[in-house]
Amino acid sequence: MNKCAIILAAGQGTRIKSKLPKVLHKACGKEMVNHVIDAMRNAEIEDVNVIIGKGAELVKERTTSRNVSYSLQAEQLGTGHAVKCAKDFLEGKTGVVAIFTGDAPLIKPETVKNLVDTHINEKNSATLLTSVIENPTGYGRIVRNGESVEKIVEHKDCNEQEIKIQEVNAGMYCFDIESLLTSLEQLSNDNAQGEYYLTDVIEILKKENKKVGAMITDFEETLGVNSRAELAKVESIMRNRINRTHLDNGVTIIDPLNTYIEPEVVIGKDTIIYPGNVIEGKTVIGEDCILYPNSRINNSTIGNGVEIQSSVILDSKIGDETTVGPFAYVRPESNIGEHVRIGDFVEIKKSTIGNNTKVSHLTYIGDAEVGERCNFGCGTVVVNYDGKKKHKTIIGDDSFIGCNTNLVSPVEVKDNTYIAAGSTITKEVPEGSLAIARAKQQNIEGWVERKKLK
Protein backbone atom coordinates (compact mmCIF):
# COMPACT_ATOMS: atom_id res chain seq x y z
CA MET A 1 0.00 0.00 0.00
CA ASN A 2 1.37 3.40 -1.00
CA LYS A 3 1.63 5.87 1.87
CA CYS A 4 2.19 9.62 1.94
CA ALA A 5 1.68 12.43 4.42
CA ILE A 6 0.55 16.04 4.48
CA ILE A 7 1.67 18.36 7.27
CA LEU A 8 -0.33 21.53 7.87
CA ALA A 9 2.19 24.32 8.51
CA ALA A 10 0.78 27.45 6.86
CA GLY A 11 -0.43 29.45 9.86
CA GLN A 12 1.42 32.40 11.39
CA GLY A 13 0.18 31.68 14.91
CA THR A 14 -0.86 35.12 16.14
CA ARG A 15 -1.19 34.02 19.76
CA ILE A 16 2.48 33.08 19.94
CA LYS A 17 3.29 36.75 19.16
CA SER A 18 6.39 36.27 17.06
CA LYS A 19 7.87 37.32 13.73
CA LEU A 20 8.83 33.67 13.27
CA PRO A 21 6.20 31.31 11.80
CA LYS A 22 4.72 29.25 14.61
CA VAL A 23 5.87 25.86 13.33
CA LEU A 24 9.51 27.04 13.33
CA HIS A 25 9.59 27.62 17.06
CA LYS A 26 11.79 24.97 18.61
CA ALA A 27 10.97 22.28 21.14
CA CYS A 28 14.14 20.80 22.64
CA GLY A 29 16.34 22.33 19.96
CA LYS A 30 14.35 21.22 16.91
CA GLU A 31 11.64 23.09 14.98
CA MET A 32 8.17 21.76 15.75
CA VAL A 33 7.45 21.01 12.10
CA ASN A 34 10.68 19.02 11.84
CA HIS A 35 9.64 16.90 14.82
CA VAL A 36 6.48 16.02 12.89
CA ILE A 37 8.33 15.38 9.61
CA ASP A 38 10.76 13.08 11.45
CA ALA A 39 7.83 11.24 13.03
CA MET A 40 6.44 10.56 9.54
CA ARG A 41 9.79 9.28 8.29
CA ASN A 42 10.28 7.08 11.35
CA ALA A 43 6.80 5.69 10.70
CA GLU A 44 8.05 4.58 7.25
CA ILE A 45 6.32 7.37 5.31
CA GLU A 46 8.87 8.83 2.91
CA ASP A 47 6.63 10.96 0.67
CA VAL A 48 5.86 14.05 2.77
CA ASN A 49 4.24 17.31 1.62
CA VAL A 50 4.30 20.43 3.80
CA ILE A 51 1.55 23.04 3.40
CA ILE A 52 3.22 26.44 3.71
CA GLY A 53 1.81 29.96 3.90
CA LYS A 54 3.02 32.62 6.30
CA GLY A 55 6.81 32.80 6.14
CA ALA A 56 6.82 30.22 3.35
CA GLU A 57 10.41 30.77 2.26
CA LEU A 58 11.71 30.55 5.81
CA VAL A 59 9.78 27.33 6.44
CA LYS A 60 11.28 25.93 3.24
CA GLU A 61 14.76 26.96 4.35
CA ARG A 62 14.42 25.27 7.75
CA THR A 63 12.93 22.03 6.37
CA THR A 64 14.77 21.62 3.06
CA SER A 65 17.32 19.17 4.50
CA ARG A 66 14.50 16.71 5.13
CA ASN A 67 13.72 16.33 1.42
CA VAL A 68 10.01 17.16 1.49
CA SER A 69 7.74 18.74 -1.13
CA TYR A 70 5.64 21.86 -0.60
CA SER A 71 2.18 23.20 -1.39
CA LEU A 72 1.35 26.88 -0.96
CA GLN A 73 -1.75 28.04 0.93
CA ALA A 74 -1.64 31.75 0.08
CA GLU A 75 -4.76 32.50 2.13
CA GLN A 76 -5.57 30.69 5.36
CA LEU A 77 -9.16 29.61 4.74
CA GLY A 78 -9.37 26.59 7.03
CA THR A 79 -7.95 23.10 7.34
CA GLY A 80 -10.03 21.78 4.45
CA HIS A 81 -8.74 24.55 2.21
CA ALA A 82 -5.16 23.73 3.28
CA VAL A 83 -5.55 20.13 2.14
CA LYS A 84 -7.19 21.30 -1.10
CA CYS A 85 -4.00 23.26 -1.76
CA ALA A 86 -2.18 19.90 -1.85
CA LYS A 87 -4.38 18.63 -4.69
CA ASP A 88 -1.45 18.53 -7.12
CA PHE A 89 0.52 16.47 -4.59
CA LEU A 90 -2.30 13.95 -4.19
CA GLU A 91 -3.55 13.60 -7.76
CA GLY A 92 -2.26 10.53 -9.53
CA LYS A 93 -1.49 8.79 -6.24
CA THR A 94 -3.19 5.70 -4.88
CA GLY A 95 -3.18 4.40 -1.32
CA VAL A 96 -3.48 6.42 1.86
CA VAL A 97 -2.48 9.83 3.15
CA ALA A 98 -1.82 10.74 6.79
CA ILE A 99 -2.65 14.35 7.67
CA PHE A 100 -1.01 15.91 10.73
CA THR A 101 -0.47 19.41 12.06
CA GLY A 102 2.98 20.97 12.17
CA ASP A 103 2.46 22.42 15.65
CA ALA A 104 2.05 19.09 17.48
CA PRO A 105 5.65 17.95 18.03
CA LEU A 106 4.88 15.28 20.64
CA ILE A 107 3.36 12.86 18.16
CA LYS A 108 5.21 9.53 18.22
CA PRO A 109 6.23 7.59 15.10
CA GLU A 110 4.60 4.44 16.46
CA THR A 111 1.29 6.32 16.81
CA VAL A 112 1.48 7.47 13.18
CA LYS A 113 2.27 3.92 12.06
CA ASN A 114 -0.53 2.44 14.18
CA LEU A 115 -3.03 4.95 12.76
CA VAL A 116 -2.09 4.09 9.18
CA ASP A 117 -2.08 0.34 9.90
CA THR A 118 -5.47 0.57 11.62
CA HIS A 119 -6.86 2.47 8.64
CA ILE A 120 -5.59 -0.11 6.16
CA ASN A 121 -6.54 -3.18 8.20
CA GLU A 122 -10.08 -1.93 8.87
CA LYS A 123 -10.52 -0.89 5.22
CA ASN A 124 -11.70 2.57 6.25
CA SER A 125 -12.20 5.55 3.98
CA ALA A 126 -11.12 7.76 6.87
CA THR A 127 -9.62 7.07 10.29
CA LEU A 128 -9.46 9.73 12.97
CA LEU A 129 -6.93 10.01 15.75
CA THR A 130 -8.82 10.65 18.98
CA SER A 131 -8.22 10.97 22.72
CA VAL A 132 -10.28 10.45 25.83
CA ILE A 133 -9.93 13.35 28.27
CA GLU A 134 -11.44 14.20 31.62
CA ASN A 135 -12.50 17.72 30.64
CA PRO A 136 -13.41 17.83 26.92
CA THR A 137 -14.72 21.41 27.00
CA GLY A 138 -14.03 23.14 23.70
CA TYR A 139 -13.22 19.98 21.76
CA GLY A 140 -15.20 18.28 19.01
CA ARG A 141 -16.87 15.12 20.35
CA ILE A 142 -16.62 11.76 18.60
CA VAL A 143 -20.08 10.22 18.26
CA ARG A 144 -19.79 6.50 17.61
CA ASN A 145 -22.11 3.80 16.37
CA GLY A 146 -20.38 0.76 17.80
CA GLU A 147 -16.78 0.82 16.54
CA SER A 148 -17.61 3.12 13.65
CA VAL A 149 -17.53 6.92 13.88
CA GLU A 150 -20.92 8.43 13.15
CA LYS A 151 -19.98 12.11 13.28
CA ILE A 152 -17.91 14.84 14.93
CA VAL A 153 -19.94 17.36 16.91
CA GLU A 154 -18.39 20.67 17.91
CA HIS A 155 -18.73 21.54 21.60
CA LYS A 156 -21.14 24.43 21.00
CA ASP A 157 -23.43 22.16 18.97
CA CYS A 158 -23.60 19.24 21.45
CA ASN A 159 -26.94 18.06 22.86
CA GLU A 160 -27.36 16.80 26.43
CA GLN A 161 -26.00 13.35 25.61
CA GLU A 162 -23.19 14.45 23.31
CA ILE A 163 -21.84 16.97 25.83
CA LYS A 164 -21.02 14.05 28.15
CA ILE A 165 -18.80 12.31 25.59
CA GLN A 166 -15.13 12.37 26.60
CA GLU A 167 -13.64 11.10 23.34
CA VAL A 168 -12.49 14.08 21.29
CA ASN A 169 -11.07 14.73 17.83
CA ALA A 170 -7.29 15.28 17.76
CA GLY A 171 -7.32 16.90 14.32
CA MET A 172 -5.08 14.20 12.82
CA TYR A 173 -6.30 11.75 10.19
CA CYS A 174 -5.62 9.01 7.71
CA PHE A 175 -7.64 9.00 4.47
CA ASP A 176 -8.05 6.87 1.42
CA ILE A 177 -6.65 9.27 -1.20
CA GLU A 178 -9.39 8.71 -3.77
CA SER A 179 -12.16 9.22 -1.20
CA LEU A 180 -10.47 12.35 0.14
CA LEU A 181 -10.06 13.98 -3.28
CA THR A 182 -13.71 13.32 -4.14
CA SER A 183 -14.89 14.74 -0.80
CA LEU A 184 -12.70 17.85 -1.05
CA GLU A 185 -14.58 18.82 -4.22
CA GLN A 186 -17.79 18.88 -2.19
CA LEU A 187 -16.51 21.02 0.67
CA SER A 188 -18.41 24.24 1.33
CA ASN A 189 -17.47 27.39 3.20
CA ASP A 190 -21.09 28.18 4.03
CA ASN A 191 -20.45 28.94 7.69
CA ALA A 192 -19.95 31.94 9.96
CA GLN A 193 -16.18 32.00 9.40
CA GLY A 194 -16.36 31.43 5.65
CA GLU A 195 -13.77 28.65 5.92
CA TYR A 196 -13.42 25.09 4.62
CA TYR A 197 -13.15 22.53 7.42
CA LEU A 198 -11.50 19.14 7.07
CA THR A 199 -13.94 17.73 9.63
CA ASP A 200 -16.72 18.27 7.07
CA VAL A 201 -15.09 15.57 4.94
CA ILE A 202 -16.15 13.05 7.59
CA GLU A 203 -19.78 14.13 7.22
CA ILE A 204 -19.54 13.86 3.42
CA LEU A 205 -18.08 10.35 3.65
CA LYS A 206 -20.78 9.21 6.07
CA LYS A 207 -23.51 10.48 3.73
CA GLU A 208 -21.95 8.30 1.05
CA ASN A 209 -22.02 5.33 3.46
CA LYS A 210 -18.24 5.18 3.54
CA LYS A 211 -16.60 3.56 6.56
CA VAL A 212 -15.05 5.96 9.09
CA GLY A 213 -13.05 4.64 12.03
CA ALA A 214 -11.04 6.06 14.91
CA MET A 215 -7.99 5.15 16.95
CA ILE A 216 -7.55 6.40 20.50
CA THR A 217 -4.16 7.66 21.67
CA ASP A 218 -2.77 9.49 24.69
CA PHE A 219 -4.02 13.10 24.69
CA GLU A 220 -0.54 14.33 25.57
CA GLU A 221 0.72 13.28 22.13
CA THR A 222 -1.84 15.40 20.33
CA LEU A 223 -1.19 18.66 22.17
CA GLY A 224 -0.89 21.56 19.76
CA VAL A 225 1.00 24.79 20.39
CA ASN A 226 -0.70 28.17 20.03
CA SER A 227 1.12 30.24 22.66
CA ARG A 228 4.47 30.50 24.40
CA ALA A 229 2.94 28.95 27.51
CA GLU A 230 1.75 25.94 25.52
CA LEU A 231 5.18 25.65 23.89
CA ALA A 232 6.78 25.59 27.34
CA LYS A 233 4.34 22.87 28.42
CA VAL A 234 5.03 20.75 25.35
CA GLU A 235 8.79 21.18 25.75
CA SER A 236 8.57 20.14 29.40
CA ILE A 237 6.77 16.95 28.41
CA MET A 238 9.33 16.30 25.68
CA ARG A 239 12.27 16.81 28.05
CA ASN A 240 10.74 14.42 30.53
CA ARG A 241 10.21 11.86 27.77
CA ILE A 242 13.82 12.20 26.57
CA ASN A 243 15.28 11.98 30.07
CA ARG A 244 13.13 8.97 30.92
CA THR A 245 14.49 7.15 27.87
CA HIS A 246 18.08 7.75 29.02
CA LEU A 247 17.21 6.66 32.57
CA ASP A 248 15.70 3.46 31.21
CA ASN A 249 18.88 2.88 29.18
CA GLY A 250 21.16 2.96 32.23
CA VAL A 251 22.12 6.62 32.52
CA THR A 252 21.95 8.26 35.97
CA ILE A 253 20.32 11.69 35.82
CA ILE A 254 20.38 13.02 39.35
CA ASP A 255 17.78 15.76 38.79
CA PRO A 256 15.82 15.19 35.55
CA LEU A 257 13.78 18.36 36.01
CA ASN A 258 16.97 20.43 35.88
CA THR A 259 18.75 18.59 33.08
CA TYR A 260 18.29 19.58 29.42
CA ILE A 261 18.99 16.90 26.80
CA GLU A 262 17.97 17.24 23.16
CA PRO A 263 16.35 14.35 21.27
CA GLU A 264 19.27 13.26 19.07
CA VAL A 265 21.78 12.99 21.92
CA VAL A 266 23.25 9.51 22.59
CA ILE A 267 24.55 8.66 26.09
CA GLY A 268 26.28 5.45 27.21
CA LYS A 269 25.29 3.46 30.27
CA ASP A 270 26.64 4.19 33.75
CA THR A 271 27.25 7.82 32.89
CA ILE A 272 26.21 10.18 35.70
CA ILE A 273 24.71 13.58 34.93
CA TYR A 274 24.39 16.21 37.65
CA PRO A 275 21.84 19.07 37.57
CA GLY A 276 22.26 22.09 35.34
CA ASN A 277 23.77 20.34 32.33
CA VAL A 278 22.73 21.28 28.79
CA ILE A 279 23.45 18.62 26.14
CA GLU A 280 22.54 19.63 22.60
CA GLY A 281 22.50 18.60 18.96
CA LYS A 282 23.98 15.28 17.90
CA THR A 283 26.27 14.92 20.90
CA VAL A 284 27.47 11.40 21.68
CA ILE A 285 28.65 10.68 25.23
CA GLY A 286 30.35 7.41 26.12
CA GLU A 287 30.00 5.11 29.12
CA ASP A 288 31.12 5.77 32.70
CA CYS A 289 31.38 9.54 32.28
CA ILE A 290 30.64 12.07 35.02
CA LEU A 291 29.13 15.40 34.05
CA TYR A 292 29.31 17.58 37.13
CA PRO A 293 26.88 20.55 37.36
CA ASN A 294 26.49 23.34 34.83
CA SER A 295 28.18 22.32 31.59
CA ARG A 296 27.05 22.88 28.00
CA ILE A 297 27.98 20.29 25.36
CA ASN A 298 26.90 20.86 21.75
CA ASN A 299 27.41 18.55 18.75
CA SER A 300 30.43 16.91 20.35
CA THR A 301 31.76 13.39 20.84
CA ILE A 302 32.78 12.52 24.39
CA GLY A 303 34.70 9.29 25.02
CA ASN A 304 34.37 6.78 27.87
CA GLY A 305 35.27 7.68 31.44
CA VAL A 306 35.44 11.43 30.80
CA GLU A 307 34.84 13.92 33.63
CA ILE A 308 33.54 17.40 32.80
CA GLN A 309 33.04 20.18 35.34
CA SER A 310 31.24 23.48 34.62
CA SER A 311 32.60 23.84 31.09
CA VAL A 312 31.53 24.55 27.50
CA ILE A 313 32.37 22.09 24.70
CA LEU A 314 31.26 22.94 21.15
CA ASP A 315 31.61 20.81 17.99
CA SER A 316 34.65 18.99 19.33
CA LYS A 317 35.93 15.56 20.33
CA ILE A 318 37.12 14.53 23.80
CA GLY A 319 39.05 11.26 24.19
CA ASP A 320 38.67 8.53 26.81
CA GLU A 321 39.56 9.18 30.47
CA THR A 322 40.10 12.91 29.89
CA THR A 323 39.09 15.57 32.43
CA VAL A 324 37.76 18.99 31.44
CA GLY A 325 37.22 21.99 33.70
CA PRO A 326 36.10 23.60 35.79
CA PHE A 327 35.45 26.66 33.60
CA ALA A 328 37.15 25.38 30.46
CA TYR A 329 36.05 26.43 26.97
CA VAL A 330 36.61 23.94 24.15
CA ARG A 331 35.70 25.69 20.92
CA PRO A 332 34.70 24.14 17.57
CA GLU A 333 36.98 21.77 15.64
CA SER A 334 39.09 20.83 18.63
CA ASN A 335 40.25 17.25 19.09
CA ILE A 336 41.35 16.41 22.63
CA GLY A 337 43.13 13.08 23.08
CA GLU A 338 42.92 10.39 25.76
CA HIS A 339 44.03 10.84 29.38
CA VAL A 340 44.34 14.60 28.84
CA ARG A 341 43.87 17.26 31.50
CA ILE A 342 42.12 20.46 30.36
CA GLY A 343 41.94 22.49 33.56
CA ASP A 344 40.35 25.64 34.90
CA PHE A 345 40.14 28.74 32.72
CA VAL A 346 41.68 26.98 29.73
CA GLU A 347 40.47 27.82 26.22
CA ILE A 348 41.13 25.48 23.30
CA LYS A 349 40.25 26.66 19.79
CA LYS A 350 40.49 24.56 16.61
CA SER A 351 43.41 22.58 18.02
CA THR A 352 44.56 18.99 18.44
CA ILE A 353 45.85 17.96 21.87
CA GLY A 354 47.79 14.68 22.05
CA ASN A 355 47.28 11.88 24.57
CA ASN A 356 48.45 12.35 28.17
CA THR A 357 49.03 16.08 27.75
CA LYS A 358 48.24 18.43 30.64
CA VAL A 359 46.94 21.97 30.18
CA SER A 360 46.06 22.63 33.78
CA HIS A 361 45.09 26.30 34.08
CA LEU A 362 44.89 29.81 32.62
CA THR A 363 45.99 28.91 29.10
CA TYR A 364 44.89 29.73 25.55
CA ILE A 365 45.69 27.32 22.71
CA GLY A 366 44.40 28.29 19.26
CA ASP A 367 45.08 26.82 15.80
CA ALA A 368 47.68 24.49 17.26
CA GLU A 369 48.83 20.91 16.93
CA VAL A 370 50.07 19.67 20.30
CA GLY A 371 51.83 16.33 20.72
CA GLU A 372 51.62 13.69 23.43
CA ARG A 373 52.81 13.94 27.05
CA CYS A 374 53.25 17.71 26.96
CA ASN A 375 52.85 19.99 29.97
CA PHE A 376 51.68 23.61 29.81
CA GLY A 377 52.47 25.94 32.68
CA CYS A 378 49.98 28.49 33.95
CA GLY A 379 49.51 31.53 31.73
CA THR A 380 50.70 30.05 28.43
CA VAL A 381 49.30 31.80 25.35
CA VAL A 382 49.47 30.64 21.75
CA VAL A 383 49.52 33.96 19.88
CA ASN A 384 47.76 32.77 16.74
CA TYR A 385 46.42 36.04 15.27
CA ASP A 386 48.51 38.79 13.72
CA GLY A 387 45.65 41.22 13.24
CA LYS A 388 44.83 39.98 9.74
CA LYS A 389 44.89 36.19 9.76
CA LYS A 390 45.40 33.15 11.96
CA HIS A 391 48.62 31.10 11.99
CA LYS A 392 49.44 27.58 13.13
CA THR A 393 51.66 26.45 15.99
CA ILE A 394 53.13 22.93 16.23
CA ILE A 395 54.36 21.55 19.55
CA GLY A 396 56.08 18.17 19.55
CA ASP A 397 55.81 15.25 21.96
CA ASP A 398 57.21 15.44 25.51
CA SER A 399 57.55 19.23 25.51
CA PHE A 400 57.44 21.33 28.67
CA ILE A 401 56.10 24.86 28.30
CA GLY A 402 56.94 27.07 31.28
CA CYS A 403 54.54 29.50 32.93
CA ASN A 404 53.71 32.79 31.18
CA THR A 405 55.09 31.69 27.83
CA ASN A 406 53.97 33.34 24.58
CA LEU A 407 54.22 31.19 21.46
CA VAL A 408 53.99 33.63 18.54
CA SER A 409 52.58 31.81 15.51
CA PRO A 410 53.62 30.52 13.08
CA VAL A 411 56.16 28.65 15.13
CA GLU A 412 57.25 25.06 15.77
CA VAL A 413 58.49 23.56 19.01
CA LYS A 414 60.17 20.22 18.32
CA ASP A 415 59.96 17.03 20.44
CA ASN A 416 61.41 16.80 23.95
CA THR A 417 62.00 20.51 24.48
CA TYR A 418 61.81 22.85 27.45
CA ILE A 419 60.75 26.48 27.31
CA ALA A 420 61.71 28.65 30.26
CA ALA A 421 59.00 30.51 32.13
CA GLY A 422 58.27 34.00 30.88
CA SER A 423 59.65 33.41 27.39
CA THR A 424 58.26 34.84 24.16
CA ILE A 425 59.04 32.30 21.45
CA THR A 426 59.16 33.56 17.86
CA LYS A 427 61.51 31.02 16.26
CA GLU A 428 61.70 27.25 15.98
CA VAL A 429 62.86 25.43 19.11
CA PRO A 430 65.11 22.48 18.11
CA GLU A 431 64.55 18.98 19.47
CA GLY A 432 66.00 18.32 22.91
CA SER A 433 66.82 21.96 23.63
CA LEU A 434 65.97 24.54 26.28
CA ALA A 435 64.64 27.84 24.94
CA ILE A 436 64.99 31.02 26.99
CA ALA A 437 63.61 34.20 25.45
CA ARG A 438 63.40 36.88 28.11
CA ALA A 439 65.42 39.89 29.23
CA LYS A 440 68.29 39.23 31.60
CA GLN A 441 67.46 40.13 35.20
CA GLN A 442 69.26 43.23 36.48
CA ASN A 443 69.34 44.17 40.19
CA ILE A 444 69.98 47.88 40.95
CA GLU A 445 71.18 48.06 44.52
CA GLY A 446 70.13 51.03 46.64
CA TRP A 447 67.48 52.09 44.13
CA VAL A 448 64.59 52.13 46.64
CA GLU A 449 66.41 54.35 49.08
CA ARG A 450 67.40 56.80 46.36
CA LYS A 451 63.83 56.84 45.07
CA LYS A 452 62.55 57.82 48.48
CA LEU A 453 64.97 60.76 48.68
CA LYS A 454 63.52 62.19 45.54
From Swiss-Prot:
- What is written in the cofactor note of this entry? Binds 1 Mg(2+) ion per subunit.
Q: Where in the cell is it found?
A: Cytoplasm
Give the residues annotated as active site. 361
SUPFAM superfamilies hit by this protein? Nucleotide-diphospho-sugar transferases (SSF53448), Trimeric LpxA-like enzymes (SSF51161)
Q: Which GO terms describe its molecular function?
A: glucosamine-1-phosphate N-acetyltransferase activity; magnesium ion binding; UDP-N-acetylglucosamine diphosphorylase activity
Which positions does UniProt annotate for acetyl-CoA binding? Answer: 384-385, 421, 438
- Write down the InterPro entries for this protein, in alphabetical order: Bifunctional_GlmU, GlmU-like, GlmU_C_LbH, Hexapep, NTP_transferase_dom, Nucleotide-diphossugar_trans, Trimer_LpxA-like_sf
Named in its record, the pathway it takes part in is: Nucleotide-sugar biosynthesis; UDP-N-acetyl-alpha-D-glucosamine biosynthesis; N-acetyl-alpha-D-glucosamine 1-phosphate from alpha-D-glucosamine 6-phosphate (route II): step 2/2; Nucleotide-sugar biosynthesis; UDP-N-acetyl-alpha-D-glucosamine biosynthesis; UDP-N-acetyl-alpha-D-glucosamine from N-acetyl-alpha-D-glucosamine 1-phosphate: step 1/1; Bacterial outer membrane biogenesis; LPS lipid A biosynthesis
Identify the EC number(s).
2.7.7.23, 2.3.1.157
List UniProt keywords, sorted A-Z: Acyltransferase, Cell shape, Cell wall biogenesis/degradation, Cytoplasm, Magnesium, Metal-binding, Multifunctional enzyme, Nucleotidyltransferase, Peptidoglycan synthesis, Repeat, Transferase
Residue ranges, annotated region (Pyrophosphorylase): 1-228
Cellular-component GO terms for this entry: cytoplasm; membrane
Extract one GO BP annotation from the record.
UDP-N-acetylglucosamine biosynthetic process
Q: Which residues participate in UDP-N-acetyl-alpha-D-glucosamine binding?
A: 8-11, 22, 73, 78-79, 140, 154, 169, 226, 331, 349, 364, 375
Please give the residue ranges the record annotates as the region Linker.
229-249
Q: How does it assemble?
A: Homotrimer.
Q: Which PANTHER family match?
A: BIFUNCTIONAL PROTEIN GLMU, NUCLEOTIDYL TRANSFERASE
Q: What is this protein called?
A: Bifunctional protein GlmU
* Organism from which the protein derives: Clostridium perfringens (strain 13 / Type A)
